[in-house]
Amino acid sequence: MSTLVLLRHGESVWNAEGLFTGWVDVDLSPKGEEEARRGGRLLAEAGIRPDVVHTSLLKRAIRTANIALEEAGLHWIPVKRSWRLNERHYGALQGKNKAQTRAEFGDEQFMIWRRSYDTPPPPLAEDSEFSQHNDPRYATLPPELMPRTECLADVVRRMLPYWYDAIIPDLAAGRTVLVAAHGNSLRALVKHLDNIDDKSIAGLNIPTGIPLVYELNDDFTPRKTGGEYLDPEAAKEAIEAVKNQGK
């Protein structure tokens, strides 16, 4: 049996402002920093000591991991970073206000773009101020892998190779693994772990800053579907807040 802990980054500045973020590298808000500290405290109180962290290339996830580890007294453990754990790329919606987008395009189109499994938003122009095409952190990424927009199915496809090639080997070695990532990269992983169908995944929301713990069997399937949040009541309240974004 092995232990996998999933932690969505704390509230970002753009989360607080109600903007679509995607691959834009915004920082944590003060509330998000406190959520990251809470995540670290919850890990310490539960006696969970990760041996290794996997995170994205975006500072809101990296800083969440760093703050949580500092709070738990585990700032020294190794951290591995990959673009495959980045947030879903929201295409031309990046930088746009969610409520205004909903008002402009209507509830149905808004929810299709936000929660449909296989329908991406319009692509982002390469000359957009929110484009990552000249970002040095992606300099070694083959151009054909650099997204201009993504649906959740795209995130699943890019995330799964990392699950098999990087995370599972750590779990197989007996390490407790913390994945500090994003709402949609974690939804993609939970979809795989819990074998959630393409339609039902639309109803899954991941709260910020509350560790979700999976105890895994020897074949890396969950012993309990859905795992367990270390603060179930706070998670329930935060999930409702995520669900209501853009209203």
Curated annotation (Swiss-Prot):
Alphabetical list of Gene3D superfamilies matching this protein: Phosphoglycerate mutase-like
EC number: 5.4.2.11
Top class in the EC scheme: isomerase
List of catalytic residues: H9, E87
GO molecular function, one term: phosphoglycerate mutase activity
Catalysed reactions, as listed in the record: (2R)-2-phosphoglycerate = (2R)-3-phosphoglycerate
Family matches, as PROSITE patterns: PG_MUTASE
Pathway involvement of the protein, from the record: Carbohydrate degradation; glycolysis; pyruvate from D-glyceraldehyde 3-phosphate: step 3/5
Residues marked Transition state stabilizer (site): H182
Binding site for substrate: 8-15, 21-22, 60, 87-90, 98, 114-115, 183-184
Pfam family, any one: His_Phos_1
Any one GO biological process: gluconeogenesis
Keyword Oxidoreductase: no
Keyword Methyltransferase recorded: no
UniProt keywords, alphabetically: Gluconeogenesis, Glycolysis, Isomerase
Database matches in CDD domains: HP_PGM_like (cd07067)
Superkingdom to which the source organism belongs: Bacteria
InterPro entries linked to this entry: His_Pase_superF_clade-1, His_PPase_superfam, PG/BPGM_mutase_AS, Phosphogly_mut1
Annotated family: Belongs to the phosphoglycerate mutase family. BPG-dependent PGAM subfamily.
General function of this protein: Catalyzes the interconversion of 2-phosphoglycerate and 3-phosphoglycerate.
Name of the protein described by the UniProt record: 2,3-bisphosphoglycerate-dependent phosphoglycerate mutase
